[in-house]
């Protein structure tokens, strides 16, 4: 990602779009703060914008990250020269030459600084009138001085000039380009304490005299004093200058070689891809190996790992993925490619049945880059691991131990700990309905009917002939005062209890529970008038459904003419349950 941004920055620099280039390099630095080339490139952009202060900051950072890189010192020297600090600029160029004595840019930069120093020293009496302008412009009292001077006070109302002045304050080195502006000369004169207008007039006259002479004498005192300082402008990077570094012939040849190798590697990869699609994995593997040996891009290793996986060479797949991750870190590869290698490791370990490692690698892959595919694989692996753990925990002998302990605790009245033992039994023997049935009985004792019903349903699912589970379910429904469902549960229990292996041994308990339910429903409608009964029935959808059933209407019609016929119909468990509900609701009155 950082390399892509750098390439975009280089392209913008070539087009002299320095602000856009700065933005791209800034983004790249955010992703790769230790890359010295990025700071060097951005320094060049700032220098092109004549923002030598920021150019110096980046150049300094570049030399801190890689002190032995000559290019960084060249950037620093150029920035210092732009700021007018010739001594420091010279030191920077000299430091760079210690690392690369033949670097043409450093040598040219040093010559430029030396020439500027010589020119500054050769002024009248060695006096350089513009040497300290930068510090004077940044003086907090500068604006106050400007306003108090009659010659410059009027400039405060000139917004265009004030904007120009503000830019010069930010970058004092750019003042040299504004010396033709008479307003700027007034400011310089105010700062230097001289009358620029007067001197300029004298200089103009003397300059005219100089023009009239074909061979002016070098000893003419006014010829030099009338001219503004002609310090060479600070060196600036040219648009055609390579951004990353100054390429020597050898380096250019190396870059061309790399490009050719990458192209050749991609051709090998393409052949590998074609064979992979044909499931010709041995050939695909060899092609991906050739691609990696030709050019170091972990895309080739990821492809190689995929081929090993499909060929069921899992050891080779794991090793290749590990190499891809290690090499990817060293090559600063895209995090998406590293995430892909981590995800492949997860898939490989899952195929081997090592779900612990599979889950770990899936999680690490998602940390690098989150994708729906890996997230789905992680969830599947976690579910499989949970199931695997449950199956590994199964132990019938320990389940029996927990059942015995639970029964003892139940008999002693310690229902809470009995529930714990029965829960352990359900984990050790999840297919044994007794664990759920016994825990349901304990839940009843601690007044937890909902939990009891849940366990009864599970026990019935495991063993449809478990009559005790139906009885306990009826008891829990009675506790919830859901009498209609309680009647259904009692009738189901009665039906199951008749079958083997029960043979009616729970009949008394079932009839007792049914009787309690009928009594409770009768007590609800005690002292109820017929009008109140009809109003209540109209609000009971289950009773209304029974009354609207054509078959039940026929049975009730027969019962009115022949009450004995009703007893015959009640031999059918379904009809019996419905008639009991009608009796309990008061639709049918006995006696």
Curated annotation (Swiss-Prot):
The keyword Repeat applies. PANTHER family: STRESS-INDUCED-PHOSPHOPROTEIN 1 (PTHR22904:SF523), TPR REPEAT CONTAINING PROTEIN (PTHR22904). Residues 202-255 are annotated as: Disordered. Part of a larger complex that includes HSP70, HSP90, and immunophilins. PROSITE patterns: TPR, TPR_REGION. Residues 245-255 have a biased composition (Basic and acidic residues). This is Heat shock protein sti1 homolog. It is found in: Cytoplasm. GO terms for molecular function: ATPase inhibitor activity; Hsp90 protein binding. Coiled coil: none annotated. Residues 215-225 have a biased composition (Low complexity). It comes from Schizosaccharomyces pombe (strain 972 / ATCC 24843) (Fission yeast). One of its GO terms (biological process) is protein folding. TPR repeats lie at residues 2-35, 36-69, 70-103, 265-298, 299-331, 339-372, 399-432, 433-466, 467-500. Residues 139-178, 530-569 form the STI1 domain. GO terms for cellular component: cytoplasm; cytosol; nucleus. Its main location: cytoplasm.
